[in-house]
Amino acid sequence: MKKGSLLSGYLEDPSKTVWLILFCFTIAFFIGAAAAGLYTGDADRIIPGFITICSRPSQFTMDYFELGTLGGAFLNTAMVGLACNMMLLVSGAHCNGLTVAAYWLTVGFATFGMTFTNIWPFFFGTWIYSRIKKVKFGTVANLAMFATSMGPFASELMVRYPGLEAHGFTVQGVLAAAALGVFVGCVLPPLIAHVPNLHLGFDLYGAAPASGFLAFFIYCVLYRSPGIEVPTNTYLGDGCRFFVNVFFVSIFLLCIAAGNILERGCHRRYRDLLRHHGHKTDFTTEFGIPVTLINMGIYGLFIMLYYNIVHGMVYDGGSIVFTSAKFTGATMGAIMCMFAFVAQGAQPRTVFPIAVGYALASLLPFFAAYTGLVETQNWNLCTQAILVGMCFASGLAPITGKYGFFAGTAAGAIHATLVMSVPLWHGGFCLYNGGFTAGIVAALMVPVLDRYMGSYEERIAKKELSRKK
C-alpha cells in the first residue's frame, strides 16, 4: 500500500487483511439470513430449514431456497463460511488470492450442494494428510476447502447410501463418510499438484480436473461396479430475483467503496489489471488488495448484469419463446463460484468473450429444434445446468488473456457444448463439474492454439520487433 494512503498501517499484513475481508463476507451472509427471514415472512423457519438442508442428500442439483427456505439457505452459507474462516484462523494459514478462490467456491456451493455437515469429513481428511506429511495444517488449508467438492458423496453415505430414499444419519454412515474424507484428503492434494500439467494453468479452477477424475473413480466404486442404482436429485424452485440482486449488488458496491477507502485513487490502477492476461497470477500480490477489491466490485456487478439480462431462446410448437434466468439457490451459487477467482485472473474483459461463446453455442440446439432435426430443444441459455456451467466457463479467462477475443469465444462455445454431458462421468456427485469441463477444454485447445498462433510471449515479441522496424 502506498505511503500516505488511508489506513496504511491496516494492510501491513496482507494475509490477515484477506482473512478479515472473507470474515466480513461471512457476516454479510448471517445478516442476509436474518433479512431473508423478514423479507419472506418465515423467520421462524430459518433454523428448521437449515436443519433440513443439512440432513438431506445433496447430489447435483439441489435448490436450497426451495428445500430449506431462503433464510435457511443463507444460514447454511454463513455457517459454511464461518467454518472456513475458523479453520483458516486456527490453522494459521497464509491467506492469499488462492484462499479467496477456495472460500468462495466452498460458500458458493452452500446454496445447492454443500452443507454444514458434509464439509467436515474433508477438513478432517486433509488434516490427516498434514499429519502424515508432517506439515502444518495451515499450509494445506486451501486444499481442505477444495476437497469439499466431494460433499455430495459424504451426504450420500451419511443419510441415503445404498438406497434411493433418505434414512437419516447412522453411525455406519458417518464413519463411512469420515473414511471417504480421509481417502479424498490424502489423494486429492497430489492430484491437484499434478493437473496443471494437463491444463497448463489455463483453467483457473485448477483443483476441478483433479476432483472430477477422483469423483469418477469413487462413483464407479460406489455405484457402477457393484451395480447399485444411482439416485436422481434435481430439486428446483422459482428463485428470488429481487432479494438476491439487492444482496449482491450491495456487497459489490461496498467492495468498490472499500477499495477506494483503503487507497485513494486506486481505481486508476484498475486499468492495468484489466490489461493483464490473468494467467498464473495473484492480483492481491501483483496489484494490491485495494485494486483487487475494485475488481471484486466491478467484476461482481458484471456477473449480476449477465444473469439479469441473459435470455434463452426456445423454439416451442412453431413459436419462439424467450425465457429469463431464475434466481434459484443454484443461480446464486453460480454467481459466487464465478466470483471465486476474482483475485486470481478473472475480470470482465477476459470473461466477456466466453459469455459470447455461450450465446453462440446456444444457437445449435435452437436451430436443431427449429429445423425439425429434434422434437424438443435440449437446452438454452437459461437452462439451470447452463447457468451454472457459465460460471465455471469463466475459469477459461486466461485463454482470452493469452490468445485473444476469438479464442475466448471458441473456449466458451466448446465448454457450453460439453458441460451437460460431463456429469455422466461422476453421476452428479462432483460439485466442480463445470471446472472439470473447463480443464478438458483447456487441455484440448491450448496445444492447438500454441501450434497455430504461437505462445503469448512469442506474439508479444513479434509485435515489439515490428514496432522497432
Q: Where are the predicted features?
A:
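Transmembrane helical segments that form the transport core of multi-pass membrane transport proteins
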Residues: 266-366
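Membrane-helix interface "capping/anchor" motifs
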Residues: 86-98, 111-119, 131-142, 193-204, ...
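N-terminal signal-anchor module of multipass membrane proteins
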Residues: 2-114, 259-263, 285-294, 301, ...
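Conserved mixed alpha/beta catalytic, RNA-binding, or beta-rich assembly cores of soluble enzyme
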Residues: 89, 103-134, 145, 156, ...
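C-terminal transmembrane helix pair
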Residues: 177-194, 206, 381-456
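Structural signature of hydrophobic alpha-helical transmembrane segments
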Residues: 66-78, 109-120, 169-183, 317-332, ...
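Short, highly charged, low-complexity non-transmembrane loops/tails of multi-pass membrane proteins
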Residues: 235-240, 272-278, 455-469
